[in-house]
């Protein structure tokens, strides 16, 4: 009887929260189990799924034992789920993958090689949006942040999606894993806190992560909340790490933080996403993120919602 080679010791742990992802979770699991680099384990945290996800996960875990384990928690959200998975992770390198997304077969191998070849703590790659309602499906490779003003770039926008990076476990432990203080934007929060801890990042300029969209309602249902959470994350970073932003002129810093809120308010307004626009315009007034010229848009937003919508309609968007 032919002897099977012993599995490689675990070096990379992939943490995957799962909530009602039955149509997609098998593909997500298999993309991890099929990685070209050995020594990869998968920890899936079922976040109180009510569809067939749990049964699918247990069948897959049995097929891929001992490299895959399934944990369960009551519905708490993806960030508590990821923290639970981290507590059970055995690898010195950590990747995150949502249950409806996927990676190229060589993704973890190439990201790990980039970390091995440098002293970086984070390796990141390009990604592509796929599926119905995706806002553009052109593959995207982000810039080499190590050659830019990294603080400004990270404040401008979240630098990469949750599954487009591989991180040393020691760095994640040093910043305490994911914060659970906000409804959203806690992946962005993690990248900012990791940047404050270590500026050692390396880019792999290939598209190896794929983000699945599920139609136009994916973001818009809670867009205003995501914007306010992202603003809070930016402000918290600035307050906690003044040494990282001391080189930025005050006007530039304000444009990157408070200016983000007003930009998103106008974006929602001109897209006629008026529920979001009204909340964000009111928030801009409350937070002081406005100028005199903005008042012609902000003041109507203080009206009751039906009157605000009617006024915008009568003005053809020109409040």
Predicted regions and their residues:
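Glycine-rich, basic loop-to-helix element that forms the pyrophosphate-binding segment
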Residues: 73-89
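Short beta-strand/loop segment that forms part of the nucleotide-sugar
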Residues: 39-48, 69-74, 99
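Short aromatic/hydrophobic "clamp" motif used to bind/position activated sugar donors
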Residues: 94
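A conserved acidic beta->alpha catalytic loop
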Residues: 31, 46-55, 98
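Conserved nucleotide-sugar donor-binding catalytic segment
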Residues: 144-228
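Conserved donor NDP-sugar-binding/catalytic core segment of glycosyltransferases
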Residues: 106-138
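Catalytic core of nucleotide-sugar-dependent glycosyltransferases
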Residues: 207-215, 220-247, 270-287
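A conserved hydrophobic helix/loop-capping motif in glycosyltransferases and polysaccharide synthases
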Residues: 12-24, 28, 35-36, 45
């Amino acid at each position: 009887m032919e002897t099977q080679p012993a599995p490689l010791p675990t070096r990379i742990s992939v943490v995957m929260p799962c909530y009602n992802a039955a149509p997609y979770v098998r593909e997500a699991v298999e993309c991890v189990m099929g990685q070209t680099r050995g020594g990869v384990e998968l920890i899936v945290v079922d976040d109180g799924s009510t569809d067939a996800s749990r049964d699918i996960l247990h069948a897959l875990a049995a097929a891929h034992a001992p490299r895959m384990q399934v944990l369960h928690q009551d519905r708490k959200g993806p960030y508590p789920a990821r923290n639970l998975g981290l507590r059970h992770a055995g690898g010195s390198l950590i990747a995150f993958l949502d249950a409806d997304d996927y990676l190229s077969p060589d993704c973890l191998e190439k990201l790990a090689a980039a970390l091995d070849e440098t002293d970086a703590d984070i390796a990141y790659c390009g990604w592509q949006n796929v599926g119905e309602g995706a806002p553009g499906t052109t593959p995207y490779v982000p810039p080499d942040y190590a050659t830019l003003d990294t603080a400004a770039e990270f404040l401008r926008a979240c630098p990469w999606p949750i599954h487009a990076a591989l991180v040393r476990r020691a760095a994640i432990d040093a910043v305490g894993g994911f914060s659970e203080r906000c409804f959203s934007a806690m992946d962005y929060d993690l990248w900012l806190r990791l940047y404050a801890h270590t500026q050692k990042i390396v880019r792999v300029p290939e598209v190896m992560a794929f983000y699945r969209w599920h139609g136009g309602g994916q973001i818009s249902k809670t867009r205003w909340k995501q914007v306010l959470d992202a603003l809070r994350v930016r402000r918290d970073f600035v307050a906690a790490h003044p040494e990282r932003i001391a080189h930025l002129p005050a006007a530039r810093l304000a444009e990157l933080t408070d200016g983000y809120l007003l930009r998103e308010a106008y974006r929602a307004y001109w897209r006629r996403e008026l529920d979001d626009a009204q909340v964000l315009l009111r928030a801009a007034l409350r937070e002081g993120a406005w100028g005199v010229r903005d008042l012609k848009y902000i003041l109507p937003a203080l009206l009751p919602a039906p009157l605000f919508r009617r006024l915008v309609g009568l003005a053809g968007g020109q409040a």
